[in-house]
Amino acid sequence: MSRTTVNQGTASLRQRQKARTRQELLEAALDTFSRVGFGLATVEAIAGRAGASKGTVYAHFPDGRDGLFRELYEDLSNRTVERAQQLHQEADGLLSQIRALAQALLEVSSEPKVGLFFSIQGPALSQALEPVTGRASGAFAAMLRQDLESAAEQGALSTAADPEIVSVMLVGAMRAAGIVVAEQPDRIGELTDAIEDLARGLIKA
């Protein structure tokens, strides 16, 4: 085995270890947040939960606690959007497309610990989490706007309201449903159906 191959293998191992440690810190941050809230989720508490030192936290997240929670929120946003895009592509028709986006958001909101952070307390921490908040909502609104514009061109809508405004209102309803589901995960089906019923009023009979 050449020295180059050994060096590459060592570098790859270090990268995997670094990624694993980073993920463990993110999981510890979420766990600490769910137990004590943002105010008491200090770097010391997060490091202790992960079995790491404060230095390790700062080595991976130079901004400390805020950097940790920004990345955590961004990861959840990206996962939500990816799931939404998957379900949206499989949907057939406006009603199914709207339901698909609601389902994606409520699935994430229903997860233990995750829903508390992402759907309830996370958005309220705008100062600490900027500029990563609102990305999932923005992506949802963009997809909905295109769907509504397409339906309007086909004469399928029962409203003449601006699709951009309607899309923002629908996302707001989904976010509100996400708060409920984060606290009561067993209501995910009920809330998804409610969003669909709300959307049905937009479509001509």
Language-model-detected regions and their locations in the chain:
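Generic hydrophobic, amphipathic alpha-helix propensity
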Residues: 17, 21-29, 46, 68, ...
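Amphipathic alpha-helical packing segments from all-alpha helical-bundle domains
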Residues: 81, 128-154, 164-168
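Secondary-structure edge/capping motif, primarily at the C-terminal ends of alpha-helices
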Residues: 87, 116-122, 177-184
